[in-house]
């Protein structure tokens, strides 16, 4: 069964995990629409690599773009709350890399903003790269295997 991604995603950040998101979207028949990065040249290189049509010269432009549906935040942890505030207040859905915030107060604020603006907020927490998952994936149980993702 194939999937198709109809949403316009923007990546805030161009690091290793942002590359994984770009590849995952492509595998599902979608792609990133735009990218914002602290270093404009890195944003341009990332856009060229993945055929992204828009690169913002200033990070704040991503929050103002009416074409963007979902913002993926993969910046350093200590910047997450400032970008969450802007994205959620702008009415954008957000997928934010772990850890989503530095403390429970920031998380409560982000959840409240998402609720007030009727948008979705999710933390990109995956176990697939953790050493324990790699070890578990080697275990076979009867006919099933932990290698299969459910």
Feature map (PLM): residue ranges:
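Short hydrophobic "strand-cap" motifs at the C-terminus of beta-strands
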Residues: 12, 97, 124
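Beta-loop-alpha module in the N-terminal Rossmann-like domain of NAD(P)-dependent dehydrogenases
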Residues: 21, 54-113
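A contiguous active-site-proximal alpha/beta segment in oxidoreductase catalytic domains
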Residues: 101-149
């Amino acid at each position: 069964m194939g999937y198709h991604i109809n949403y316009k995603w923007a990546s805030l950040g161009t690091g290793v995990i942002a590359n994984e998101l770009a590849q995952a979207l492509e595998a599902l028949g979608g792609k990133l629409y735009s990218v914002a990065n602290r270093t404009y040249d890195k944003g341009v290189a990332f856009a060229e690599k993945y055929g992204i049509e828009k690169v913002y010269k200033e990070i704040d432009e991503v929050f103002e773009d009416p074409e963007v549906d979902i913002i993926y935040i993969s910046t350093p942890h200590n910047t997450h709350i400032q970008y969450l505030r802007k994205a959620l207040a702008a009415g954008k859905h957000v997928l934010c890399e772990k850890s989503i915030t530095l403390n429970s107060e920031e998380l409560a604020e982000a959840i409240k903003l998402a609720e007030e603006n009727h948008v979705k907020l999710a933390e990109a927490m995956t176990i697939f790269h953790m050493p324990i998952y790699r070890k578990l994936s080697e275990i076979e149980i009867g006919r099933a295997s932990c290698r299969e993702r459910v």
